[in-house]
Amino acid sequence: MSITIDTSVDIDLPTPPQSNGSQKRNLLLAPPSVAAHEEKLRDVFSTFDRSSTDLQMLDRLSAGFVSLPPNTYDLVLVLTDAQSDEAVRLLTRDVYTALVPAMKAGARLQLQQGSLGASEGLEAILAGLVEKDGGFEKPVQEAAVPLKLGGRKKKDKTNGVNGVQNGVATNGASTNGVGMFDPAQNNDDELIDEDALLSDDDLKRPLPRPQNCVPETAKKRRRPCKDCTCGLASQLEEEDRAREAKAAQDLNILKLNTDDLNDELDFTVQGKTSSCNSCSLGDAFRCSSCPYIGLPPFKPGEEVKIMNDMVQL
């Protein structure tokens, strides 16, 4: 009698389909002007696979009514209408704020036709995208590499009895060269009192003081201290008062009273007269028979000659 063992599987369950993690996903952003024409959307979906493509409205995304899954899309295509620039106008900062986190590293954003202007491109750059080949890409973040800082090597354990380290006696041995400086070992250093460095003779020695508060630079004016007790402040005040009094005295030399301004000023030389004794020196010539009539007064010592009834100065 022979026994045969059946090793076949009695229940054959179907293998679940494995999801292709490398499949790229696309996001189509349509303005209301494009979404109103069904034939345009049908033409777009004939190019993209419907199973890996999502369609969202730009106005709803701008208003915050739609939330996008993070780090999902490899391509973001903004549908445009040749008759209107509504799609470009709807690409505001709020749209980029919701759109950029949903893009994978290296994902691309572009228009169906044309390219973004300067202002729209600036908003994309401020959102973290990089301009490349007429579109914008999300840069790949490089992984941070940790740096290992070199520390001090741990010392091998030594025997406290004979001072043996790895079979070699280390008692009394020293390492030649310059060792590493460890700030942790200097935490217990005591501060030195500066007064302890002075002897008794140094403490008894009087401090040198400048005589009469004379500054080092003679060109600068001497300035007293705030609480001056050496008399320099009072001396400077007296000098200032004397200087002000002298300046006021110099001004009073040419000072005229109100009554003096109303009187006629006399510019003649007192005690001296002309040859005819009719007018004094410095006065105008008024006599009808005077040969100098009508002329200004002569200067002292000026030689005057009369030739052909003409005065020659």
Swiss-Prot record:
Region (Linker) residue spans: 146-203
Binding site for [4Fe-4S] cluster: C276, C279, C287, C290
Fe-S binding site A as annotated region, ranges: 213-230
GO biological process: iron-sulfur cluster assembly
CC annotations in GO: mitochondrial intermembrane space
Binding site for [2Fe-2S] cluster: C213, C225, C228, C230
GO terms for MF: 2 iron, 2 sulfur cluster binding; 4 iron, 4 sulfur cluster binding; electron transfer activity; metal ion binding
Ranges for region Fe-S binding site B: 276-290
Location, primary (coarse class): cytoplasm
Compositional bias per record (Polar residues), positions renumbered to this chain: 159-177
Region (N-terminal SAM-like domain): 20-145
Pfam families listed in its UniProt record: CIAPIN1 (PF05093), DRE2_N (PF16803)
Spans annotated as Disordered: 1-25, 151-187
Lineage top rank: taxon: Eukaryota
Cofactor(s) named in the record: [2Fe-2S] cluster; [4Fe-4S] cluster
Motif Cx2C motif 1, chain ranges: 276-279
Listed InterPro entries: Anamorsin, CIAPIN1, Dre2_N
Annotated compartments: Cytoplasm; Mitochondrion intermembrane space
Keywords of the record: 2Fe-2S, 4Fe-4S, Cytoplasm, Iron, Iron-sulfur, Metal-binding, Mitochondrion
Motif stretch (Cx2C motif 2): 287-290
Domain notes: The C-terminal domain binds 2 Fe-S clusters but is otherwise mostly in an intrinsically disordered conformation. The N-terminal domain has structural similarity with S-adenosyl-L-methionine-dependent methyltransferases, but does not bind S-adenosyl-L-methionine. It is required for correct assembly of the 2 Fe-S clusters.
PANTHER family linked to this entry: ANAMORSIN
Subunit field text: Monomer. Interacts with tah18. Interacts with mia40.
Stated role: Component of the cytosolic iron-sulfur (Fe-S) protein assembly (CIA) machinery required for the maturation of extramitochondrial Fe-S proteins. Part of an electron transfer chain functioning in an early step of cytosolic Fe-S biogenesis, facilitating the de novo assembly of a [4Fe-4S] cluster on the scaffold complex cfd1-nbp35. Electrons are transferred to dre2 from NADPH via the FAD- and FMN-containing protein tah18.
Family according to the record: Belongs to the anamorsin family.
Name recorded for this polypeptide: Fe-S cluster assembly protein dre2
Name of the gene encoding the protein in the UniProt record: dre2
